[in-house]
Amino acid sequence: AFGNPVADTGKALLCAAKPVTDLGITAVDDKTLKVELNVPVSYFLSLMYFPTFYPMNQKFFESCGDTYGTSADTVLSNGAFVLTSYEPAATAFELVKNADYYDADRIALDGLNYQVIKDSQQALMSYQNGDLDITLLNGEQVEQVKDDPEFTSVGAGYLWYISPNMDAVPELANLNLRRAITFALDRDSITNDVLKDGSSPAYTAVPAQFATGPDGSDFSADQTKFAEFCAYDPDKAAEYYEQAKAELGKDSFSFTMVVDADDAPQKVAQVVQEQLQTTLPGFTLELKVEPKKQRVQDMQDGNFEIGLTRWGPDYADPMTYLGMWVTG
């Protein structure tokens, strides 16, 4: 996870220069939390919606022991809805309106019923049969229903990217090899011809229409340097590839990329594999398909060469993306 030390002395705390008691956060009373900020932070309140900051009843938590959060009876919360039915690996869970919620009069829904349907076609059929009110679609389904008046396209804000493990694989630390890889990727083809689900090619580190700068313009409009290195340019790819081969003293390269066992990531990975191996002679990319949980764990442990992964925004500020690239 990536965050920013917006609380008073937060940076010093992260660097272990000060104790937790100096963080700048005080419990005024049982229902009031005071946070002192270093600078004005427009997105601070939205940070408080993040699960990391949910209040926890210590007495209840300790009474549940290892079973905390594993069933409806071991979950205690103060939100707009109350979890009434849930079991691990359940195919459905239910929430009902919390009558004690401080703003209950403004909550229009009486409850929410979630159905866990792993097969995307079955999920669409359940929607069409009236069993679901909302469902997510894959690219093929979007093609089928895009003219339906009930179809709505909403940007999720996820940024998919290829992560090279430069610490474990010395060749990937070579700048020219990485430049060869990025110029060999046709992002427009991936989104328009493969995904076909409304996804946009990523030419900026912060997606368009996510945030505005101080002058009111779209923040992504100024990310020209990032866009420059995301352009599909086979000639530049070949040029950087030759430089990389000369610097590394190798004519061929072989890497393995870990990929989620879901439909869309696998399709993208196959196209990435084809584009790289076609544009860069002697470049081999093997695909290792894993359940998402295992893929994430392997990448966290450094047990990978290249990973196809994604990042979604945690709060409404460009640093939710840019913070990933800050070192030190």
Over which residues does each language-model region extend?
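Acidic-aromatic pocket-rim loops
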Residues: 1-6, 294-328
